């Protein structure tokens, strides 16, 4: 990876990553992942699964998470633009219930790529205005018996730390976006806390559990 920058966000452990593309008259070349360039992966099982997701315009997905095994995700747009969302679901965390929204985009003209690290202990989803293709690098293999979700439109999510422009856009797109019944009717933060499964995500001073 070329000229990697890893930047903190308003919620500890959630990280923004950017790196350069090598460009010339032929086009560009980019290393999209080199584990040794991403020190936060040292506390994980490294990348064990890669997913690709295509979404049509005006779609909301999420907010998903799992345990046994825990799954952290590095998310990048391959084509188009998404607004990536993460919400802290760790019991006892000082930022429990708070969410962030980041714009991730990619085009052939970009000289940089950007990605987001959503560690275990965070529910993840996104919304799109236009068609988009994204890729996930995952630190755990998918496990249907231990997956769960928070509804992205749950009224008790606190978006006060998120970019206000993106929050307003999210509120607007909710009126017309396509969202599955499973995602729409997912947990609120209150019902998640009341679930025995929430004991799988306990905040500690060392960060997210894995």
Residue ranges with predicted function:
Residues 105-131, 138-139:
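Conserved metal-binding segment of the jelly-roll/cupin
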């Amino acid at each position: 990876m070329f000229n990697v920058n890893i930047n903190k966000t308003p919620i500890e452990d959630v990280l923004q990553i950017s790196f350069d593309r090598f460009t010339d008259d032929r086009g560009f070349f980019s290393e999209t992942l080199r584990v040794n360039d991403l020190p936060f992966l040292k506390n994980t099982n490294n990348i064990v699964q890669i997913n690709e997701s295509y979404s049509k315009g005006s779609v909301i997905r999420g907010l998903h998470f799992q345990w046994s095994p825990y799954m952290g995700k590095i998310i990048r747009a391959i084509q188009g633009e998404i607004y990536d969302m993460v919400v802290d679901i760790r019991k006892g965390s000082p930022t429990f219930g708070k969410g962030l929204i980041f714009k991730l985009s990619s085009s052939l003209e970009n000289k940089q790529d950007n990605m987001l690290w959503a560690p275990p202990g965070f529910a993840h989803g996104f919304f799109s205005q236009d068609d988009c293709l994204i890729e996930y690098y995952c630190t755990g293999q998918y496990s249907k018996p231990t997956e769960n979700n928070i509804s992205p439109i749950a009224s008790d999510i606190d978006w006060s730390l998120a970019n206000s422009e993106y929050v307003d856009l999210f509120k607007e797109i909710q009126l017309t976006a396509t969202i599955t019944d499973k995602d729409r009717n997912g947990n609120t933060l209150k019902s998640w806390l009341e679930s025995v499964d929430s004991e799988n995500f306990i905040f500690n001073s060392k960060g997210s559990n894995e």
